[in-house]
């Protein structure tokens, strides 16, 4: 398994007469499988809400979806299951999947009762998942349908960081319309995972399978971007680095002396992690300049090796006295993706502050950006919600969650999930 890394600037040329210039840097990184590479062993922890509001079809559907995932695990994989209401309990201790019948019975016995304390479930999930993480792809699927009424949201966010420190990826799944998208998104972002919205119980199985497929396609783990810039190049001070694919989120930069470091988490073999960096460049003399270099530090569970380094990849730019722009289409697409996310964030902030007209205007702007990207489904949702606000209607909880989801991803038309 190897690193596949590419760098693209928004404009490869620079005006020699400009005192300062701004450029966006697109970094794409993935794991590149060799012919003999096999799927890595998995360490899956399910953290499931079984509070009273999950009674009936919601809990039965989630149990069915969980059992469907377990059927896909192999004997060398490890599984743990945590259930939480206002307390948390271990349903399945971290173990290899060798007694499917006993595991299924334990999950089937879950009943809906009690309140909701997400942080208690996540804490216990981290403890169990950590027991089986050695040389495995370790993911936590955290599902809830409610607000953290008996828990502490700040503690949830700290636990997301703890999971990341333990090299655990956390995917959060919001079930129905009454969960807190700010909290679940922040947990997922801090642990390099994704946020999913299960609007209807019938979507649970498909969503679980999508996440399981993503987990199965991980080739390398615990990846970090290492960026070393020349003295004439600087990262933006505010929000300098964002991920724009597979989903959009802001990433945290840690300064390590001359190196800027960003944790990426898992690297997949079937899709790239794409980052967009905001750079500022001082005036440079005409000619070609190396303005930085990029490396990836990562772990390879297949070989048991950690802290491996990819070959350094130089970042170059051409400085011209007769400046001619040379823009890159792929970088422009990434810029639009991030713009849609930022515009929707501004709209949500305005709506919370009571500025309905301002929110509607920003949603319309985001809808136009989505259309430029070819994201017709996202544009429709954003424009529909803008129109509702303009006509004096309130956005439902479902509307707000759809808005959040389309800001982070490009929605695909629904398709029937495979049974195999």
Swiss-Prot record:
Any Pfam family: VWA
PROSITE patterns per record: VWFA
Native source organism of the sequence: Synechocystis sp. (strain ATCC 27184 / PCC 6803 / Kazusa)
Segments of this protein annotated with the region Disordered: 389-420
Domain of life (superkingdom): Bacteria
PANTHER family to which the protein is assigned, alphabetical: CALCIUM-ACTIVATED CHLORIDE CHANNEL REGULATOR, ZINC FINGER (C3HC4-TYPE RING FINGER) FAMILY PROTEIN
Protein name: Uncharacterized protein sll0103
Domain VWFA span(s) in chain numbering: 43-215
Signal peptide range: none
């Amino acid at each position: 398994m190897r690193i596949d890394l590419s760098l693209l600037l928004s404009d490869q040329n620079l005006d020699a007469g400009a005192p300062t210039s701004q450029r966006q840097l697109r970094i794409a990184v993935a794991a590149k499988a060799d012919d003999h590479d096999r799927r890595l062993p998995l360490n899956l922890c399910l953290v499931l809400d079984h509070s009273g509001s999950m009674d009936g079809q919601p809990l039965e559907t989630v149990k069915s979806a969980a059992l469907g995932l377990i059927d896909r695990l192999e004997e060398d994989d490890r599984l743990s299951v945590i259930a939480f209401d206002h307390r948390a309990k271990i349903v399945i201790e971290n173990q290899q999947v060798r007694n499917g019948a006993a595991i299924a019975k334990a999950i089937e016995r879950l009943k809906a009762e009690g309140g909701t304390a997400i942080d208690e479930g996540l804490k216990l999930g981290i403890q169990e998942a950590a027991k089986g993480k050695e040389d495995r792809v370790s993911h936590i699927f955290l599902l809830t349908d409610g607000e953290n009424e008996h828990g502490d949201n700040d503690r949830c966010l700290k636990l997301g960081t703890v999971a990341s420190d333990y090299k655990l990826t956390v995917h959060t799944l919001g079930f129905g319309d009454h969960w807190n998208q700010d909290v679940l998104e922040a947990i997922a972002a801090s642990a390099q995972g994704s946020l999913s919205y299960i609007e209807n119980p019938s979507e649970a199985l498909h969503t679980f399978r999508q996440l399981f497929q993503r987990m199965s396609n991980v080739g390398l783990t615990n990846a970090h971007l290492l960026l070393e810039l020349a003295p004439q190049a600087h990262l933006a001070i505010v929000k300098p680095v964002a991920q724009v694919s597979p989903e959009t989120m802001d990433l945290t930069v840690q300064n390590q002396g001359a190196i800027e470091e960003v944790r990426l988490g898992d690297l997949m073999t079937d899709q790239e992690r794409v980052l967009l960096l905001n750079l500022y460049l001082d005036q440079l003399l005409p000619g070609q300049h190396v303005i930085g270099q990029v490396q990836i530090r990562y772990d390879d569970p297949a070989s048991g090796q950690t802290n491996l380094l990819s070959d350094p990849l130089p970042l170059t730019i051409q400085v011209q006295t007769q400046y001619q722009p040379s823009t890159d289409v792929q970088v422009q697409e990434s810029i639009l993706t991030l713009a849609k996310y930022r515009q929707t964030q501004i709209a949500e902030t305005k709506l919370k502050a009571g500025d309905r007209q301002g929110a509607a205007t920003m949603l319309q702007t985001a809808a136009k950006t989505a259309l430029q990207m070819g994201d017709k489904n996202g544009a429709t949702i954003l424009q529909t919600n803008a129109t509702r606000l303009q006509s004096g209607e309130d956005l439902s909880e479902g509307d707000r969650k759809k808005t959040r989801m389309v800001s982070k991803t490009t929605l695909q038309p629904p398709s029937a999930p495979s049974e195999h």
